[in-house]
From Swiss-Prot:
Class in the EC hierarchy, top level: hydrolase
Residue ranges constituting the Peptidase S59 domain according to the UniProt record: 822-963
GO biological process: mRNA transport; post-transcriptional tethering of RNA polymerase II gene DNA at nuclear periphery; protein import into nucleus; ribosomal subunit export from nucleus; RNA export from nucleus; telomere tethering at nuclear periphery
Superkingdom as given in the UniProt entry: Eukaryota
Keyword list, A-Z: Autocatalytic cleavage, Hydrolase, mRNA transport, Nuclear pore complex, Nucleus, Phosphoprotein, Protein transport, Repeat, Translocation, Transport
GO MF term (any one): nuclear localization sequence binding
Protein name per its UniProtKB record: Nucleoporin nup189
Modification type Phosphoserine: residues: 724, 1051
The keyword Ligase is assigned to this record: no
Sequence ranges of the GLFG repeats: 26-29, 66-69, 112-115, 152-155, 177-180, 308-311, 335-338, 350-353, 381-384, 399-402, 435-438, 521-524, 585-588, 611-614, 627-630, 646-649
Ranges of compositional bias, category Low complexity: 62-77, 588-600, 653-663, 1094-1104
Biased composition, class Gly residues, residue ranges: 78-90
Length: 1807
C-alpha cells in the first residue's frame, strides 16, 4: 500500500483509491529495483503497509534519501527526512523506530527531519519521538553515540561516545536543525546569523530596557489626558505584573537599580527561547566559525554532511556563503527545498526535491525534483519525484509546488497517485503533475489534457485530490510556485485545490477573479465567490485543514485573506473584511479589518486567525489567538498573542493601543464556535465608558450622547447568544410601541445583529435593587389575549416567540427541549421489562413510577395505559419531565389525554430539594424553627389541587388527581413579606404549557390548566381571564379611589373558540370584581352568603374556575393581595391602573392623560379589528383567538360583581378550615366546621381519610392477641390489654418513623428481664437497671442519627470538622479512626476517654482556660476548639475571648445551633459523666428555656396552622423522665401522621394507661352511678377511642372498629356504638370472616340481634325488627314496634297470621311491660274474639268484651294507621256487644257519631 510492489491502495497496483498502474509506485515510496529514492525512504520488494515486520519497512527502507528517514546500507551520505534507519517502520515495526532510527553505515550523515541517530556501533536502539532520551532514541534533536552528523528538526547533538542525549528544543547537535543546532566544533543554526533574517530583537528581561517613563494617554470621552504612574502601563511591560518584572530584575542581578544584561531575542537569531544553551533558531554563538543560516548561509569550514530540514548544512540545503536558498557547495545531503546534486552518484535527495539551486538544470529545482543527467535512479522529492525510469527527458519535473514528474513517479506530485488518479502509464511527455500545496503545475491544454493526475497535486477534480490543478491554460509564474488553471468544482476531499484561472505567483502576488470551486483544499482551498485584490466580503464555502484559502491570491509567503467562513485546522479567516487583504503566508497572515472568530489548531477558538509564524490583524477589538511562532499585529487595538511575542520574535507594527482601563471578561464561559462567523457590532466609542477610570481631582462634565447611553449588550465579536432579546421601550400599559422599526430578520442568525436599545429608565435606582423591572413591549396579543397576530393564526404563544425567536420556515430552534440523560431518569418497571410486556399487559401497567435522580419521582396510583406510546423510552424526559422543583406530565400543549387515560391519572408526586431559600444567602433553610421554613410548609399545604402528604428533608410529597405542571419557584421568594404571612391570598400560580407563569409574590404555583385535566362540556367554557393586583403603595384611607390595581391581559391564558353569537355569548370571560373577591363583600368584610353567590353566571357551575386563590377566612378586603401572573423571562410589571368611583367598577384609568388617550385609541381600533363584518362564523370557529366583543367592553367599563363563586373542588386544607374549637366530626364520615360568620358547610371527609395503612392490620392483630375481653361489673363486655403486653413486636411490624417510635417506647417502658445479681440490694438493682436503660437509649439515639451524621461527615471539608460531626453523633470509633488517619495524635488519644472520668473533663476544661488565658484561642481551629468543648462536657456555648473589635477577639459559638433537637439531647446524655435519663432531660429543658433562639424546639416537622405540636419522641422521653399526661401524647401530628390517623397515638395511649399504668389522662372523674372503688372514667380517652373507631369504619375496617370500641370506658357508649356499628355494616349479611371475628371479640348475641333489628327498621322490615328485638330481649322496644306499625297493619289488612306471629314473641314476657294492658293486650283479645276462642266459655267471652271495650277507650292512637285499626276493632267489638246485649260495654266504645246514634236507637228500642 505505502510502497509495496504493485500493491493496491494509494498509488500502486489495484484497489482502493488509485487506478491500476503498470508502473510500480506507492503512495509514500516507490518500488523500484534501482536505488532511487522515495518519499519516506526507498522501497524494498517485501515491505507492507503500516508496521508489518518486513525486511524493508515503510519509513525506514534501505534506500538513500526520503522525507522521514532512510536506511543506509552503504557508506553513501544520503540525508533522510526523519532520520530513520533500516528495519524501521512508521508505526512501530520491530526494527528501529520511525522518526529517529539509527543508520547501519559506518559513517552515515543522513539527517532526519526531527533528528537522526547516526551510529557506527550497535549500541543504539533508537526509539521514536523521544524528546531528549539517551543515545539511540531520537526525537527532536537527540544525540547519537557516534559522530553522526544528522541534524534534527530542532537541532540534535552528537557527542562521540556520550550516551546522554540532550532534548530537542535547544540542545546542541552536530547537524543542522531546522530551528537551530550546533555542531562541534562548528556551530550552525537554522535561521540565525547571516541568512535572510539575522537580527536580535529586544525581549523583556527586567525593567532596564526600556527604562521607566510616565505613560500618558488621551481620554476619548473627555478629550483630556490621563497620566499613569505605573511601569506596567508602559507598552513594553503591559503583559507582566510587578512581581514578574521584579523577578526578572533579580535574575539579571539588578536588585538595586543597576541595569546590566541586555540580551535580546530576535526573530531568527535570538537567545535561547526554550532554555537551551544554544539558540533554538540559530543565535550567533561566540566561537563558531560555521554558521548555517536558514536559507543558505555560508559554512566555510563545514564539512559535516548532516542535513537539516531544508537541506544539508543549512536550513534550505545550501552550504555556501550567505546565500538565500542554497549555494553550490558539495553538500551531499538533501535539503527541504532542494538538494545540491552533483554529477556524482550520490543519490540523496532533499525533502521536496533532488536538485540544488546552482545546478544547470532546465527546471528550477527549489521545489521540484532533480534532473541528473548521469544517474537514472536519482532521488525524488517529497511531492514530485523522477521515476526510476526517468532518463532526464522530462525537464519540467514536478516538485513540491510545481511540475509533475514525467514518469510513474510516486509521492505527491507524480502523474500517478493514490487518491483518485485515473491514468494508465501516461507517456513521459506530459508535465501535468502538481505539488502538494496546490501551488500548481504548469498544465498545458495543448497536450495531454487527459494526462495522469497525482494524488497530492494532480490535475483532477476527483474527491481525493490534495491540491490538484484542473486542466486549463498554462499560466506559469515565477519559480513555479503558483501556476494555476481554471478548475471546475473540486471533490469533497480536495486538499488545496486552486480555484482560479489566474496565475498565483510564489511570493504574495494575487490573482484575478476565477470561477469558484465548491471544494476546499487541505492547505487552503479557495472558497466560492473569491474576489481577488478587492476583499469585498466574499464568502467562501469551505474550510481547509490548515486554514481556508481566501479569495485573494494565496501562496506560501503571503496570501490575502478575504471573507470566507470556513475554518481551518490551523486557523481560518472569516467574513466581514472591511478592507482589501494583504497576502498571508506561511510565516504570517496579514488580515485586514477582519472580525474572525475561528481558532487554530494550537489555540482555542478566538476572534482572529493566526498565521504559522505570526499573526497580523487589523482593527480587532480583542484577540486571543496568535500564530504558532508569534503574532505580528498590524494596527491592532490591544492585540496580544498567546505566547506574548512570536517564537521568532513577534514584531507588532503600528499598533493602536486601547485606553488603559479595567475590563471584564466578555466571555468567561468560553465561546461557541457555532456563532464564530457572525458579525458583531460594537457600540460607538463615544458611548463606551471605562469601568475603572483614572483618578482625577474632580469629575469632568460630559456632554449628552446623541445615542442612548445604555445598549442592551456590547456587540463584541466574541459574544454569542442563542436568541435575541425582545425589544423594549418605555410605553404605557396598553401602548404597544417597539424600540426598533426595522423588520425582524428572517434567518436563523440574522437576529443576532439586531441592535436593541434599553430605555435609560431601566438603569435608574429603585427601592428594591434586587430586581430590574423592564417595561415589556405590549402587543396586540397582550391586550386581546392570543388574538390574531399580523394576520396569521396565533397558534404559537407570543411569550414563547419572545423568549426564543425562531425561523418559522425551518423551525430549527425549539422552544422547549428537555435533554434526557439516561443516567438521570428511571422508570419502574424498567424499559427492558416493559419491552417484554405484551400489548394487552401494556394497557394496564400497575405500580408504574417515573423519576429523575436528584429531582423527584411520580408514582401513579392507578394502572396506566402505555400502549399508546410509540417509544417507551420517550416517557422519561419527554412525557414525564422533572426540572428543579417542578414535575410536568404531558408538557406539550394539547398532548394530554382525557382524565383517567394514559398517564393522566391520580398519582403521588415527590419533589426533592424544595427547601425555602434564605433571602440573604440564597441557601436552603433546613431549620424547622425558622419562620420562613414554617411559612413554606404552610404554603405547601395551601397549594390548590394538591393533597399535602409530607414535607421532610426537603422532599415535598403530595397527591394530585390529574396531571399538569406542579412545583415551586423560589426566584421571587425574597419578595414575600414575613410580617404578612397570615394575609397571604393564596399560592396558586397557573401557566399554560409549556410556559411558566410565575408570580412575583410567591414561590409556589400549581395548575390544572392542562387539556384533559378538567374536560369542558362546551367549547365556550374557556375563560379570558383578567388579573388584578392590588398595589399596596396606595393610601389606605383614600376616599375617592380604590387601591391601584394592576391589570394583566395575559396573552398566554387558555383561549376559547367562539362560534355563533347566540346565548353562549352570555357566558362571558370571568372578571374578578375588586368589590367582591374570594366570597367577601368589601362593604361589610363578611363572607358573602349563598344568596349573593346564586346570581353568578351559569358558566361558573361548569368547570369554570378563577385563577385568584381564595383568601384566608380572616382576610379582610382591604388587606387582600391578589396574585398577578407575570412572565418568567422578564417578570414584567405593567404600569399600575386605578378603578374609578364605585359606579364604574372595573374602569381602567391610567396614570396620565396621554396614556389614557393611547389606551382609548387602541381599544377602539382593536374592537373594530376584532369584528370585521365580512368575518364568517366558520373563520371564528377555526380561529383560536379570543375576540373582544361589546359585552367584554361593558364588563371592562362597568364591571361584574357576581362572577365569583365557591369552587366545587375547594379542599378542606384551606387556612382556617381546621379550627380545633369549631371542627366536629359526625359518625357517618362527615365533618362540620364553623367559620367566623354563621355559614355552616358540611363536607364529606372520606376522601381525606388515609385509605391504606399497610401496617395497621398487623399491629391490630398483635394487640388483639394481647387483649383480654371480659365482663365488667355491669355485666357488659369490655376489652383491656394484658399487663404482660410489650410493644417491641410493634416496632418489628412497622416501618419508617413509626418503627422508631415503637423502638423508643419499648426501650423506655417495656418490662426488662435483665440478669442482675441477686445479692444486690433493691436500690442498687434499680440504679443498675436505670444505667442499662440509659445505655439502650444511647444506642438508639446513635442509630437514629447515624445516617444523618455520616452524611454530614462526608460533606465536611476538614478532618477536624469531620471528627466533630462524628462526635455529635456519638460515633466515637469512627472519630478515632479519622483522627488516626489525619495523624492528629492528640485527638486520637483524647477521644476514647469520652465520658470516662470527671477528672478527664476537668483537665480538658483546664486546657481551654489556658488557651483563653494566654491568648492562644484565636489560633486554635474552630472545630478543634468545639471538640475540646465536647470533651470537657460543655454542650451549650463555646465561650470566646476578648472584646469585639480587638485583634485577639474570638466569638462565642453556640454548640447546638442548627442541630436537631434529638442530637442536642444526645449531647447532654453522652458528654455528661454518670448522668441519668431524667437528669439529661432536665438539662435539656433548662438549656431550651435558656437559649430559645439557639436551640431547636422539639416540634414535629409536619406541624401546620401555626400550632406547635411537640414531637412524640420528646414527649415519650419527657414522660419517662418527668411524667406527663396523655393529652399531649395523643395528637396525631406529633407522630408525623395525618391529622385523621389516630392509630399510633391510640395504641400508645392504651399501652401506657392500661397495660403499664404509667401515665393517664388528666380528666378522669368519679362516676356517681358506680361504686367508689371503680376507676374513674376519662372523657378524653373515650373521645380518642371513638375517633380511631370512626377512622377504621370509614375506611371499611368495621370489624376492627368493633375491637376498638370495646375499649370504651362508658358502658352505655360502648353498647350503643357497637350496636350502631354492627347495624351500619350488616347490609350484606355476615360472612364467615365476620362471624369468626365477632366470636373472637365475644360480641354478645343480644348486641348482634339488636343491630339486626336496627337494620330491619332501616329497611322497613317491621316484622323482622320485632323478631330481632324480641330475640335481643328488648321487649319494650318490640312492644312499641307492635303498636306503631305491625299490629295496626295486620288489623287493617285482616292478616290474622301476621298478627298472631307477632304476638307469640311476647308470651311470658308481658308482666314486665307496663303498657301491655292498654296496648298489646287489646290486639291479643281482638285476635281471640276474632277466632272465637271464647265461644265455649260464655262468661269468659263477656268478660273479654267488657275488658276490651274499656281498653279501646284508653288506646292512644296517634297516627292514621292506628286510628283506622282502632275504628275497625271498635266496630267489631260493638257488633259482639249488641249480640250479647252488653249495653254498658257499648257505651264505652270509641265509635264514630253515626255508630253511636245507631247504638242509641237500638238501646231505646230495647228499652
Amino acid at each position: 500500500m505505502f510502497g509495496q510492489n504493485n500493491s493496491s491502495g494509494f498509488g500502486g497496483g489495484t484497489g482502493a483509491f488509485g487506478q491500476n498502474n503498470q508502473q510500480t509506485g506507492g503512495l509514500f515510496g516507490s518500488n523500484s529495483n534501482t536505488p532511487g529514492n522515495t518519499l519516506f525512504g526507498s522501497q524494498n520488494t517485501s515491505t507492507t503497509g503500516f508496521g508489518q515486520n518486513t525486511t524493508q519497512p515503510l519509513f525506514g527502507s534501505n534506500t538513500n534519501g526520503g522525507l522521514f528517514g532512510n536506511r543506509n546500507n552503504t557508506t553513501t551520505t544520503g540525508g533522510t527526512g526523519f532520520g530513520m534507519s533500516s528495519g524501521t517502520g512508521m508505526f512501530g515495526q520491530s526494527n528501529t523506530p520511525a522518526f529517529g532510527g539509527t543508520n547501519n553505515a559506518t559513517n552515515p550523515s543522513g539527517g532526519g527531519l526531527f533528528g537522526s541517530n547516526t551510529a557506527n556501533n550497535n549500541a543504539n536502539t533508537g526509539t521514536s519521538f523521544s524528546f531528549g532520551s539517551n543515545a539511540g532514541s531520537t526525537g527532536f534533536g537527540n544525540t547519537a553515540s557516534n559522530t553522526g552528523t544528522g541534524g534534527g528538526l530542532f537541532g540534535s547533538q552528537n557527542n562521540a561516545g556520550n550516551t546522554a542525549g540532550n532534548t530537542g528544543f535547544g540542545s546542541q547537535g552536530t547537524g543542522g536543525g531546522l530551528f537551530g543546532s550546533s555542531t562541534t566544533p562548528a556551530t550552525t543554526n537554522a535561521f540565525g546569523t547571516s541568512g535572510f533574517v539575522s537580527s536580535n530583537a529586544n525581549a523583556v528581561n527586567g525593567t532596564a530596557n526600556p527604562p521607566y517613563a510616565v505613560t500618558s494617554e488621551k481620554d476619548p470621552q473627555t478629550n483630556g489626558t490621563s497620566v499613569f504612574q505605573s511601569i506596567t502601563c508602559m507598552p513594553a511591560y503591559r503583559s507582566y505584573s510587578f512581581e514578574e518584572l521584579r523577578l526578572q530584575d533579580y535574575n539579571q542581578g539588578r536588585r538595586f537599580g543597576n541595569a546590566s544584561s541586555t540580551n535580546t531575542t530576535s526573530a531568527f537569531g535570538s537567545t535561547p527561547a526554550f532554555g537551551a544553551s544554544t539558540t533554538p533558531f540559530g543565535q550567533n554563538l561566540s566561537g563558531t566559525t560555521n554558521n548555517a543560516t536558514p536559507f543558505g548561509t555560508s559554512n566555510a569550514t563545514n564539512t559535516t554532511p548532516g542535513s537539516g530540514l531544508f537541506g544539508g548544512g543549512s536550513a534550505f540545503g545550501s552550504n555556501t556563503t550567505n546565500t538565500g536558498f542554497g549555494s553550490g557547495t558539495n553538500n551531499a545531503s538533501g535539503g527541504l527545498f532542494g538538494q545540491n546534486n552533483n554529477t556524482t552518484s550520490t543519490p540523496s535527495t532533499g525533502l521536496f526535491g533532488g536538485s540544488t539551486f546552482n545546478q544547470q538544470k532546465p527546471a528550477f529545482s527549489g521545489f521540484g525534483s532533480t534532473t541528473n543527467t548521469t544517474n537514472t535512479g536519482t532521488g525524488t522529492g517529497l511531492f514530485g519525484s523522477n521515476n526510476a525510469t526517468n532518463t532526464g527527458t522530462g525537464q519540467t519535473t514536478g516538485g513540491l509546488f510545481g511540475g509533475a514528474a514525467t514518469g510513474t513517479g510516486t509521492g505527491f506530485g507524480s502523474s500517478t497517485g493514490g487518491f483518485g488518479s485515473n491514468t494508465n502509464n501516461q507517456p513521459n511527455s506530459g508535465t501535468m503533475g502538481t505539488g502538494l500545496f496546490g501551488f500548481g503545475a504548469n498544465n498545458n491544454t495543448a497536450n495531454n489534457n487527459t494526462a495522469p493526475t497525482s494524488t497530492f497535486g494532480g490535475n483532477n477534480s476527483s474527491n481525493f485530490s490534495f491540491g490538484a490543478n484542473n486542466n486549463a491554460a498554462t499560466k506559469p509564474s515565477g519559480f513555479g510556485f503558483g501556476s494555476t488553471t481554471t478548475t471546475p468544482a473540486s471533490g469533497g476531499f480536495s486538499f488545496g485545490q486552486n480555484a482560479n484561472n489566474a496565475p498565483k505567483p510564489a511570493f504574495g502576488s494575487t490573482a484575478t477573479t476565477a470561477p469558484k470551486p465548491a471544494g476546499t483544499g487541505l492547505f487552503g482551498g479557495l472558497g466560492a465567490g473569491a474576489n481577488t485584490n478587492t476583499a469585498t466580503n466574499a464568502t467562501g464555502t469551505g474550510g481547509s485543514l490548515f486554514g481556508n484559502a481566501n479569495t485573494a491570491g494565496s501562496n506560501m509567503f503571503g496570501s490575502a485573506n478575504s471573507s470566507t467562513p470556513g475554518t481551518g485546522l490551523f486557523g481560518s479567516t472569516q467574513t466581514n473584511n472591511a478592507t482589501s487583504n494583504t497576502g498571508t503566508g506561511l510565516f504570517g497572515s496579514n488580515n485586514a479589518n477582519t472580525t474572525n472568530t475561528g481558532g487554530s489548531l494550537f489555540n482555542k477558538p478566538s476572534t482572529t486567525t493566526g498565521g504559522l509564524f505570526g499573526n497580523t490583524t487589523a482593527q480587532q477589538p480583542s484577540t486571543t489567538t496568535s500564530g504558532l511562532f508569534g503574532a505580528s499585529n498590524t494596527n491592532n487595538q490591544a492585540q496580544t498573542s498567546n505566547f506574548g511575542t512570536g517564537l521568532f520574535g513577534g514584531s507588532q507594527a503600528g499598533q493602536q493601543q486601547q485606553p488603559l482601563q479595567a475590563s471584564i471578561d466578555q466571555n468567561p464561559y468560553g465561546n461557541n464556535p457555532l456563532f464564530s462567523s457572525t458579525t458583531s457590532q460594537v457600540a460607538p466609542t463615544s458611548i463606551q465608558e471605562p469601568i475603572a477610570s483614572p483618578l482625577t481631582s474632580k469629575p469632568t462634565p460630559k456632554k449628552a450622547a446623541s445615542l442612548p447611553q445604555f445598549w442592551l449588550s456590547p456587540r463584541s465579536h466574541n459574544t454569542a447568544r442563542l436568541a435575541s432579546i425582545s425589544s423594549f421601550a418605555k410605553s404605557a400599559v396598553m401602548n404597544s410601541t417597539s424600540a426598533s422599526g426595522k423588520p425582524k430578520s428572517l434567518h436563523l442568525f440574522d437576529s443576532l445583529n439586531d441592535d436593541v436599545l434599553l430605555s435609560a429608565d431601566a438603569f435608574t435606582p429603585r427601592q428594591n435593587i434586587k430586581k430590574l423591572v423592564i417595561t415589556h413591549k405590549i402587543s396586540k396579543d397582550d391586550i386581546l389575549q392570543n388574538g390574531v397576530k399580523n394576520g396569521n393564526d396565533a397558534k404559537s404563544d407570543s411569550k414563547v416567540q419572545e423568549k426564543a425567536p425562531q425561523n418559522e420556515a425551518d423551525g430549527s430552534l425549539k422552544k422547549d427541549e428537555h435533554v434526557v440523560l439516561s443516567d438521570d431518569y428511571w422508570m419502574k418497571p424498567s424499559i427492558e421489562e416493559l419491552s417484554k410486556y405484551p400489548k394487552e399487559k401494556l394497557c394496564s401497567v400497575h405500580q408504574f413510577s417515573v423519576g429523575r435522580t436528584g429531582y423527584g419521582q411520580v408514582a401513579f396510583l392507578k394502572p396506566v395505559d402505555l400502549s399508546g406510546f410509540e417509544k417507551l423510552e420517550d416517557i422519561p424526559g419527554k412525557v414525564v419531565v422533572f426540572e428543579r422543583k417542578i414535575c410536568a406530565v404531558y408538557p406539550v400543549e394539547g398532548s394530554s389525554p382525557p382524565l383517567g387515560e394514559g398517564l393522566n391519572v391520580p398519582a403521588i408526586i415527590t419533589l426533592e430539594k424544595t427547601w425555602p431559600l434564605s433571602r440573604e444567602t440564597r441557601e436552603p433553610i433546613k431549620d424547622p424553627q425558622n419562620p420562613r421554613y414554617i411559612q413554606h410548609v404552610k404554603r405547601l399545604h395551601r397549594i390548590k389541587d394538591t393533597e399535602f402528604i409530607d414535607f421532610n428533608d426537603g422532599k415535598w410529597i403530595f397527591k394530585v388527581q390529574h396531571f399538569s405542571r406542579y412545583g415551586l419557584l423560589d426566584d421571587e421568594e425574597e419578595e414575600n413579606d414575613m410580617s404578612s404571612t397570615s394575609n397571604e391570598a393564596g399560592n396558586l400560580k397557573k401557566y399554560d404549557q409549556p410556559n411558566l407563569k410565575v408570580s412575583g409574590k410567591n414561590d409556589s404555583f400549581v395548575t390544572h390548566h392542562t387539556p384533559g385535566a378538567f374536560p369542558n362540556d362546551s367549547k365556550n367554557k374557556e375563560l379570558n381571564r383578567h388579573f388584578l393586583k392590588v398595589d399596596d403603595s396606595a393610601p389606605l384611607d383614600d376616599t375617592f379611589m380604590s387601591k391601584k390595581v394592576k391589570l394583566d391581559f395575559s396573552s398566554d391564558s387558555n383561549v376559547s373558540e367562539r362560534g355563533d353569537y347566540d346565548d353562549n355569548a352570555k357566558k362571558v370571560d370571568e372578571v374578578i370584581s375588586i368589590e367582591k373577591v374570594d366570597g367577601y363583600s368589601k362593604e361589610n368584610n363578611v363572607p358573602l352568603s349563598e344568596d349573593d353567590l346564586s346570581n353568578s353566571s351559569e358558566s361558573s357551575n361548569e368547570s369554570v374556575y378563577s385563577l385568584v386563590e381564595e383568601s384566608d377566612a380572616s382576610l379582610a378586603a382591604d388587606n387582600m393581595d391578589i396574585e398577578d401572573i407575570s412572565e418568567e423571562s422578564d417578570r414584567e410589571e405593567l404600569s399600575s391602573m386605578r378603578f374609578g368611583a364605585q359606579d364604574f367598577h372595573g374602569l381602567v384609568v391610567t396614570d396620565n392623560w396621554r396614556d389614557q388617550l393611547n389606551l382609548s385609541v387602541q381599544r377602539s381600533a382593536l374592537i373594530k379589528a376584532a369584528f370585521p363584518e365580512s368575518q364568517s362564523n366558520a373563520n371564528l370557529k377555526n380561529s383560536r383567538g379570543i375576540y373582544y366583543n361589546e359585552h367584554d367592553l361593558v364588563t371592562d367599563i362597568f364591571g361584574n360583581q357576581n362572577l365569583d363563586t365557591d369552587r366545587p373542588w375547594q379542599s378542606l386544607d384551606k387556612p382556617g378550615a381546621f379550627i380545633p374549637s369549631k371542627f366536629h366530626f359526625t359518625a357517618n364520615g362527615s365533618c362540620i366546621y364553623v367559620l367566623k360568620s354563621s355559614d355552616v358547610k358540611i363536607r364529606s371527609i372520606y376522601d381525606f381519610i388515609p385509605t391504606k395503612d399497610p401496617n395497621g392490620t398487623k399491629l391490630l392483630e398483635y394487640q388483639l392477641d394481647q387483649t383480654e375481653v371480659y365482663l365488667d361489673l355491669s355485666g357488659t363486655h369490655a376489652a383491656s390489654p394484658r399487663s404482660s403486653m410489650t410493644v417491641k413486636p410493634l416496632s418489628l411490624c412497622s416501618s419508617g418513623y413509626e418503627s422508631i417510635v415503637w423502638d423508643l417506647t419499648s426501650i423506655l417502658f417495656d418490662p426488662k428481664n435483665y440478669s442482675l445479681p441477686s445479692e444486690l440490694s433493691s436500690e442498687a438493682r434499680e440504679v443498675l437497671y436505670q444505667k442499662l436503660v440509659r445505655e439502650s437509649l444511647s444506642e438508639w439515639i446513635t442509630k437514629t442519627l447515624e445516617h444523618e451524621t455520616t452524611t454530614l461527615a462526608k460533606e465536611a471539608e476538614t478532618s477536624e470538622e469531620r471528627i466533630y460531626i462524628l462526635l455529635t453523633g456519638n460515633l466515637i470509633g469512627q472519630a478515632c479512626e479519622e483522627a488516626v488517619q489525619s495523624q492528629n495524635n492528640r485527638l486520637s488519644t483524647l477521644i476514647p476517654l469520652v465520658n470516662s472520668d470527671v477528672d478527664i473533663q476537668q483537665e480538658v476544661k483546664q486546657q481551654l482556660e489556658e488557651w483563653r488565658k494566654h491568648g492562644d484561642l484565636p489560633f486554635i481551629n474552630k472545630f478543634t476548639r468545639l471538640i475540646f468543648e465536647l470533651l470537657s462536657g460543655n454542650t451549650d456555648i463555646a465561650e470566646g475571648c476578648g472584646t469585639k473589635g480587638d485583634e485577639d477577639y474570638v466569638q462565642s459559638i453556640p454548640i447546638t445551633k442548627n442541630m436537631t433537637w434529638l442530637r442536642a439531647f444526645g449531647l447532654k446524655l453522652w458528654y455528661n459523666t454518670d448522668i441519668s435519663i431524667g437528669e439529661a432531660m432536665q438539662l435539656y429543658v433548662e438549656s431550651l428555656q435558656k437559649f430559645p433562639e439557639i436551640m431547636q424546639k422539639p416540634i414535629a416537622t409536619s406541624a401546620v396552622q401555626g400550632i406547635e405540636v411537640y414531637d412524640i419522641i420528646y414527649l415519650l422521653l419527657k414522660a419517662y423522665a418527668m411524667g406527663t399526661s396523655l393529652e399531649e401524647l395523643t395528637i396525631p401530628e406529633s407522630a408525623k401522621c395525618s391529622p385523621l390517623n389516630y392509630r399510633v397515638v391510640w395504641q400508645l395511649a392504651i399501652y401506657l394507661s392500661k397495660a403499664r399504668s404509667l401515665c393517664d389522662f388528666s380528666d378522669r372523674v368519679v362516676d356517681i352511678n358506680m361504686a367508689e372503688d371503680l376507676k374513674p372514667i376519662s372523657v378524653h380517652s373515650d373521645q380518642l377511642t371513638l375517633a380511631y373507631a370512626s377512622q377504621l369504619e370509614a375506611s371499611g375496617q368495621w370489624l376492627w372498629s368493633l375491637f376498638v370500641l370495646l375499649h370504651l370506658e362508658n358502658v352505655e357508649t360502648r353498647t350503643s356504638t357497637i350496636t350502631s356499628c354492627l347495624a351500619r355494616n350488616l347490609r350484606g349479611g355476615l360472612g364467615a370472616g365476620a362471624v369468626e371475628m365477632i366470636e373472637k371479640l365475644c360480641i354478645p348475641e343480644s348486641w348482634l340481634n339488636e343491630a339486626k333489628a336496627l337494620y330491619a327498621r332501616y329497611v322497613g322490615d317491621h316484622l323482622n325488627e320485632l323478631y330481632f328485638l324480641q330475640e335481643a330481649a328488648l321487649y319494650e322496644d318490640a312492644h312499641k314496634v307492635l303498636l306503631d306499625t305491625l299490629a295496626p297493619q295486620a288489623v287493617i289488612s285482616g292478616n290474622k297470621t301476621q298478627l298472631k306471629k307477632a304476638l307469640e314473641g311476647f308470651n311470658g314476657q308481658t308482666d314486665g311491660l307496663a303498657s301491655w294492658r292498654f296496648g298489646g293486650q287489646i290486639y291479643s283479645d281482638y285476635l281471640d274474639l276474632l277466632e272465637g276462642n271464647f265461644d265455649a266459655n260464655q262468661e269468659l267471652k263477656l268478660f273479654t268484651l267488657r275488658k276490651i271495650s274499656v281498653a279501646l277507650k284508653e288506646l292512644n292512637a296517634t297516627n292514621l294507621l292506628q286510628k283506622a285499626a282502632l275504628h275497625k276493632i271498635s266496630r267489631f267489638v260493638n257488633a259482639l256487644c249488641n249480640e250479647e246485649s252488653l249495653t254498658d260495654a257499648i257505651c264505652n266504645l270509641p265509635l264514630p257519631l253515626a255508630d253511636s246514634l245507631a247504638n242509641l236507637q237500638n238501646i231505646s228500642v230495647q228499652f
